[in-house]
């Protein structure tokens, strides 16, 4: 048979059927699994290189997640009808898959591994990211590549006080929590979430619920592997020569590294570490030992020294204890012409954050497989090489920048006012000007301040803190506000953002096999203390949103017109709306329900547009006074343009009090006059009067003048 190695496993999971299949598609890959959940179908493949590239001192794992438009029965929009560079969501999902599987490869494994996940069908109800993570885990487990899995994953919602397993797209929209987690049988490896100010207890409960919920998936992968797994690759054990080299590196470097890590300032510390490393490698080269292997051993020795110092003495690299947050300085309004700005400095980490307010025309149009939609809140995170004192690539954002920006986006998004209350498009740019750990959390703090400086009515400020973990057999330590070195050498990156009322975002990545609920609870409680401290420091700069938007920002006025009048405002081919825009200098957005948003740089501009639109959608009222312009004069009176594009006749008898010999004696073409609508003639034409209006003040003086004005005896009717 052609597909004699085809195997299938299915289970009921979260009210829907999860199906895992292998042996039929992509059979030349080391591992390939087709996973279906509802009508969402993905293909995950895994291929590993059989040899290590010379000089390779890291694990080259690549994860590529791709959404095909045909999966939802669509053709890509735009000029090119083919999927191109990865979208933001594809990049984020690639990272989502990468993060829980990376820690489960053996220490010292250097073979290149590539995971590719393609979305083949999307039912627009079941999100493909969870299915993709499960499929990738299954493909790795079957591949024979050394992998200490399998990994399970789930999405958790929170509606009406109840946790929901794998909520549908419609349920996610009404949920107060959107949490994705992944892990093994023993514990959790990765968490990513957006929440509406939930308590630490609720967040921990969601993680515990999710960990239990994906255990059947792990069991299904194990059962599939019992039938379909390939023979495991042999693991290369450390040779006697490598053990001797590691001992020699320890002998040459330990004391020098201890002294270097006693330096509290980052730049000076790195210079001393670099000097120790150069001396060690020079000695080893003279002894004709492997310098490339020694570099990795040097990193491991660094980790050992830092980790044990923290566990034994409770003292960190920069001299702090495990709970202390670095000194903070928050400033707002630092850039004169921007709509909102903030400079947030925490130790040697600094973010310059700028907020810009725009109109609906500035919204990001996203062409996704579900269809086109618009995004009104944009957050862009930039990490230039100078922020860490290095040279490097400058250009389009990398995966890390996209991921950090989205993390900060999730932290702020639940607090944003609705479009009906604040009809602006918001773009925030975070420029990381210095970095020594927690730059994404500095972005959260800076974004909160910059938005409030711009007048965005956030109900409460938002702050974020990054937590770390050092875990050995002899104990563990949870670290508040970690440095870059503590991130690299530690076992956990645990980021929590929120307000004084609760958590808005939580992201966790574990570099060891898993952590316990006890450690996670300690980290959450410690993070809350740190977050409240940071909020207190931020309040010294700004306690809440400014009363109004910046003078440099557009003023948006919202008016409503009847739906059947929209065509009158737009005009044939957009002729009328273009004329209004040109006349007023405003940006105007018209929605299908008759809502019109007018963005102007001054109140005068906005009023000009409002008056013109009102004139098109409303009827002038008898007895009301209007400002108009004389457009034509005749023997029998003057024609006045008023109420937008309306024209009316001021009969010669209504031009002024007393006798008027000639129309031209009172008005000329182009004069601005104040008129009162006094009725319609038998042909429906508007009749106006100037004589009953005080031309200086615009006041109605009907009761002060006679019923009829003067006129020429030969004036035409």
Curated annotation (Swiss-Prot):
Major enzyme class: transferase
- Superkingdom of this entry's organism? Bacteria
The record's annotation in SMART domains points to: KH (SM00322), S1 (SM00316)
Q: Name one GO cellular component term.
A: cytosol
Which keywords label this protein?
Answer: Cytoplasm, Magnesium, Metal-binding, Nucleotidyltransferase, RNA-binding, Transferase
Annotated signal sequence is: none
Domain annotation KH: ranges: 554-613
Q: Where does Mg(2+) bind?
A: 487, 493
Q: Which InterPro entries match?
A: ExoRNase_PH_dom1, ExoRNase_PH_dom2, ExoRNase_PH_dom2_sf, KH_dom, KH_dom_type_1, KH_dom_type_1_sf, NA-bd_OB-fold, PNPase
Localization per Swiss-Prot or TrEMBL: Cytoplasm
- Report which reactions are catalysed by this protein: RNA(n+1) + phosphate = RNA(n) + a ribonucleoside 5'-diphosphate
One Pfam family name is S1
The cofactors it requires, by name, are: Mg(2+)
Please report the stretch or stretches of sequence annotated as the S1 motif domain. 623-691
Annotated family = Belongs to the polyribonucleotide nucleotidyltransferase family.
Q: What does this protein do?
A: Involved in mRNA degradation. Catalyzes the phosphorolysis of single-stranded polyribonucleotides processively in the 3'- to 5'-direction.
HAMAP family associated with the record:
PNPase
Return the protein name.
Polyribonucleotide nucleotidyltransferase
Q: Which species expresses this protein natively?
A: Acidiphilium cryptum (strain JF-5)
Q: What is the lineage of its organism?
A: Bacteria, Pseudomonadati, Pseudomonadota, Alphaproteobacteria, Acetobacterales
């Amino acid at each position: 048979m052609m597909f004699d190695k085809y195997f299938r496993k299915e289970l009921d999971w979260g009210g829907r059927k999860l199906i895992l299949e292998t042996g039929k598609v992509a059979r030349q890959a080391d591992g390939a699994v087709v996973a279906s959940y509802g009508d969402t179908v993905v293909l995950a493949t895994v291929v590993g290189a059989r040899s290590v590239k010379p000089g390779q001192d890291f694990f080259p794992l690549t994860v590529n997640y791709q959404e095909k438009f045909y999966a939802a029965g669509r053709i890509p929009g735009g000029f090119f009808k083919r999927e191109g560079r990865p979208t933001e969501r594809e990049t984020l999902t690639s990272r989502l898959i990468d993060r829980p599987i990376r820690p489960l490869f053996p220490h010292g494994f250097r073979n290149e591994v590539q995971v590719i996940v393609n979305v083949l069908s999307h039912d627009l109800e079941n999100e493909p990211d969870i299915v993709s993570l499960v499929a990738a885990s299954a493909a790795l487990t079957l591949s024979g590549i050394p992998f200490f899995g399998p990994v399970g994953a789930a999405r958790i919602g929170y509606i009406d006080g109840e946790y929901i397993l794998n909520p549908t797209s419609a349920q996610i929209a009404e949920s107060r929590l959107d949490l994705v987690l992944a892990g093994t049988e023993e514990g959790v490896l990765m968490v990513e979430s957006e929440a509406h100010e939930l308590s630490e207890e609720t967040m921990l409960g969601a993680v515990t619920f999710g960990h239990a919920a994906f255990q059947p998936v792990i069991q299904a992968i194990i059962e599939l592997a019992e039938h379909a797994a390939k023979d495991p690759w042999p693991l290369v054990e450390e040779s006697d020569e490598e053990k001797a080299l590691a001992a020699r590196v320890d002998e040459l470097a330990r004391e020098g590294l201890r002294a270097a890590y006693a330096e509290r300032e980052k730049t000076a510390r790195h210079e001393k570490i670099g000097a120790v490393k150069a001396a060690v490698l020079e000695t080893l080269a003279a002894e004709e030992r492997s310098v490339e292997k020694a570099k990795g051993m040097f990193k491991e020795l660094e980790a050992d020294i830092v980790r044990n110092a923290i566990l034994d003495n409770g003292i960190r690299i920069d001299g702090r204890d495990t709970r202390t947050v670095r000194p903070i300085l928050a400033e707002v309004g630092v850039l004169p012409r921007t709509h909102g700005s903030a400079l947030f400095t925490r130790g040697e980490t600094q973010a310059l954050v700028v907020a810009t307010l725009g109109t609906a025309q500035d919204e990001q149009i996203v062409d996704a497989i579900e269809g086109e939609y618009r995004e009104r809140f944009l957050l862009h995170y930039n990490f230039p090489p100078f922020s860490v004192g290095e040279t490097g690539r400058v250009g389009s954002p990398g995966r890390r920048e996209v991921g950090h920006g989205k993390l900060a986006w999730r932290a702020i998004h639940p607090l944003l006012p609705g479009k009906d209350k604040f009809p602006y498009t918001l773009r925030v740019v975070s420029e990381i000007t210095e970095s020594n750990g927690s730059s994404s959390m500095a972005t959260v703090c800076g974004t909160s301040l910059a938005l409030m400086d711009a007048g965005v009515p956030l109900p409460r400020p938002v702050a974020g803190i990054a937590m770390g973990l050092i875990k050995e057999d002899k104990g563990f330590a949870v670290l508040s506000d970690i440095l870059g070195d503590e991130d690299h050498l530690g076992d956990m990156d645990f980021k929590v953002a929120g307000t004084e009322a609760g958590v808005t975002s939580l992201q966790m990545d574990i570099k060891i096999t898993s952590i316990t609920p006890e450690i996670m609870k300690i980290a959450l409680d410690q993070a809350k203390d740190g977050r409240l401290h940071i909020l207190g420091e931020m309040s010294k700069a700004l306690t809440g949103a400014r009363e109004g938007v910046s003078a440099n920002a557009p003023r948006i006025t919202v008016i409503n017109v009847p739906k059947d009048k929209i065509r009158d405002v737009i005009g044939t081919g957009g002729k009328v709306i273009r004329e209004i825009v040109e006349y007023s200098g405003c940006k105007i957005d018209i929605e299908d329900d008759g809502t019109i948003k007018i963005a102007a740089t001054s109140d005068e501009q906005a009023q000009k547009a409002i008056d013109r639109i009102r004139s098109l959608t409303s009827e002038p009222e008898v007895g009301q006074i209007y400002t108009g312009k004389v457009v034509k004069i005749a023997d029998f009176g003057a024609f006045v343009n008023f109420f937008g594009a309306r024209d009316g006749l001021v009969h010669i008898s209504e031009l002024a009090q007393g006798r008027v010999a000639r129309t031209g004696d009172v008005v000329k073409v182009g004069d601005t006059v104040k008129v009162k609508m006094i009725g319609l003639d038998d042909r429906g034409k508007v009749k106006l009067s100037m004589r009953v209006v005080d031309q200086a003040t615009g006041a109605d003086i009907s009761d002060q003048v006679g019923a009829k004005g003067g006129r020429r005896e030969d004036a035409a009717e």
